[in-house]
């Protein structure tokens, strides 16, 4: 840190002359800005679509939210007709898009392009308030290539994280009442996608306001006004948005799904605990191919806590060496970002870590700029890595083995033979809107335009799946005489070789009694057809 003082003084953002330049924005040449944003869109497009083939199939939790939105489009009520543990923001976004554009396979991919592009833009807004030069592009580029690319899964994580990034972009300039109202509302909006993230964003903001009050020796009246703006706007959005869904589903149903379930049963699945670190760890079949992925995994998991630990350790020296306005901006990122990490710490997984680490990436680049030649060399290495990944990652998608399927929801590019075989086999034996049930992972409902008649999106052999939910599945299969059911061999085995609360025995008995086996896929999943006598 021997070069801390002179470097920090050069990290304060764009100069006044740069800001007034007609050919630049915050000191960034217009051509560079356009290239950055257009390049981000192109990167995401080539990662989500195969040219002249179709939308790349993305397996992930987004398929649950898409299925739920289709159910809502057809008149079902979330939390009463079917289960969901997150607040309704994600389904609401997809529902609005389906009403406006129709149910199409490309819609979630379009959403992912928009989410990624806006995140890149917000990171740039924040970075330009802390530093100048080409390094302002690096946090967003690292986020895109090291993190976002690996989890192109349009779930609540990305929506809520974008809201929090917008909070930082709004407040980093100043904390006027109008800006605090907007920030509090955005924290509330984040909660409408991910309960704990919105709450922790507000906690981080409030901690910063208390710190600022003490550091600037503001009056209590000023502090109370700021708190009232933030908390008031937060509550207004949370109660206003969620209140409608609670009223429609019934407050008891809404509370059980979004609060009680999370407190009592969410951690019943090992993947929602610290064990997620082991579950996410890349499988090392071929070391030469997997080592880069392992390096990315370790970076994605570890960078946020490491950056915040280093930042707060050096914060006294930073406060002595930097202008007051810059210190305020850095502390805002530090408090809110660290609060977000605390929110995911009990169940750190790679997706959760990536979804909250963009503020940490901005701080990381700023810190490296402050550490003289060693920091500059590290930044060069990060630039080279990010630029290489920006070329290799979309190129790998475009040159990968692929097959095309013409589905009821659109043209789909499939990048693995198993997924292709599953879709083709089921497609040939079903028709759009037909009832169908997948036990473990809902991979086929949205793409094949099939309907899950049960109240749950998937089942587990843990306390995460409640006995009454299993009963609801059996009741729905019987009431609707569902013809095809797909079972998973993994639901016959306890996770990690121990009993986590398996309640599926009645369902196994029901399927064995009323269905007959017709197909086994290479991964062991089976399709069962209702016996002829019962149709």
Q: Where do the PLM segments sit?
A:
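Transmembrane-helix motifs of polytopic, lipid-linked glycan transferases
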Residues: 110-131, 166, 311
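Transmembrane-helix signature of polytopic, membrane-embedded enzymes
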Residues: 123-146, 161, 178-182
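Membrane-interface transmembrane helices that cradle and orient dolichyl/undecaprenyl
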Residues: 165-182, 214-218, 290, 297-327, ...
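Short acidic/glycine- and proline-prone juxtamembrane loop motifs at membrane-interface regions
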Residues: 152-160
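Specific aromatic-rich, kink-prone transmembrane helix
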Residues: 159-187, 206-212, 360-363
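Membrane-interface alpha helices of multi-pass inner-membrane proteins
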Residues: 144-148, 180-195, 201-209, 236, ...
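Short periplasmic/luminal acceptor-recognition loop of GT-C membrane glycosyltransferases, typified by
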Residues: 412-464, 470-496, 521-524, 528-530
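Hydrophobic/aromatic-rich transmembrane helices and adjacent perimembrane loops
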Residues: 199, 339-341, 345-380
């Amino acid at each position: 840190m021997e070069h801390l003082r002179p470097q920090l003084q050069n990290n304060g953002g764009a100069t006044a002359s740069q800001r007034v330049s007609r050919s630049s924005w915050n000191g960034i040449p217009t051509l560079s800005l356009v290239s950055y944003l257009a390049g981000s869109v192109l990167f995401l497009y080539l990662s989500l679509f195969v040219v002249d083939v179709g939308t790349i199939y993305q397996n992930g939790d987004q398929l649950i939210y898409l299925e739920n939105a289709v159910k809502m489009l057809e008149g079902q009520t979330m939390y009463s007709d079917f289960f969901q543990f997150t607040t309704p923001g994600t389904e609401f976004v997809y529902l609005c898009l389906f009403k406006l554009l129709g149910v199409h396979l490309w819609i979630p991919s379009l959403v992912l392009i928009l989410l990624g592009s806006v995140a890149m833009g917000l990171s740039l807004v924040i970075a330009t308030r802390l530093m100048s030069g080409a390094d302002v592009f690096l946090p967003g580029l690292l986020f895109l290539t090291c993190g976002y690319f690996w989890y192109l899964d349009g779930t609540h994580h990305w929506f809520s994280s974008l809201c929090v990034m917008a909070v930082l972009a709004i407040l980093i300039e100043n904390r006027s009442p109008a800006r605090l109202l907007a920030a509090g509302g955005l924290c509330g909006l984040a909660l409408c996608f991910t309960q704990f993230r919105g709450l922790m964003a507000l906690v981080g903001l409030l901690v910063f306001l208390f710190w600022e009050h003490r550091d600037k020796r503001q009056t209590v009246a000023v502090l109370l006004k700021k708190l009232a703006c933030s908390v008031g706007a937060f509550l207004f959005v949370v109660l206003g948005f969620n209140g409608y869904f609670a009223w429609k589903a019934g407050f008891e149903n809404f509370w059980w799904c979004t609060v009680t379930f999370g407190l009592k049963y969410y951690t019943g699945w090992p993947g929602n605990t610290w064990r997620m670190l082991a579950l996410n760890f890349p499988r090392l079949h071929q070391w030469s191919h997997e080592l880069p992925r392992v390096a990315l995994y370790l970076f994605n998991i570890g960078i946020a806590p490491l950056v915040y630990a280093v930042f707060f350790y050096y914060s006294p020296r930073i406060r002595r060496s930097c202008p007051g306005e810059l210190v305020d901006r850095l502390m805002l990122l530090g408090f809110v970002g660290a609060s977000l990490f605390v929110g995911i710490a009990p169940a750190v997984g790679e997706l959760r870590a990536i979804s909250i680490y963009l503020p940490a990436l901005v701080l990381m680049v700023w810190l490296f700029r402050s550490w003289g030649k060693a920091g500059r060399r590290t930044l060069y290495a990060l630039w080279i890595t990010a630029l290489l990944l920006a070329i290799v990652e979309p190129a790998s998608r475009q040159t990968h083995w692929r097959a095309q399927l013409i589905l009821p929801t659109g043209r789909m590019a499939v990048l693995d033979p198993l997924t292709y075989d599953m879709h083709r086999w089921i497609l040939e034996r079903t028709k759009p809107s037909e009832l169908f049930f997948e036990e473990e992972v809902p991979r086929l409902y949205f793409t094949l335009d099939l309907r899950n008649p049960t109240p749950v999106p998937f089942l587990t052999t843990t306390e995460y799946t409640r006995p009454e939910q299993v009963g609801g599945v059996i009741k729905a299969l019987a009431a609707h005489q569902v013809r095809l059911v797909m079972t998973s061999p993994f639901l016959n085995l306890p996770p990690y070789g121990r009993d986590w609360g398996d309640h599926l025995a009645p369902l196994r008995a029901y399927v064995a009694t009323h269905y007959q086996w017709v197909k086994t896929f290479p991964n062991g999943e089976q399709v069962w057809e209702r016996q002829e006598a019962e149709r």
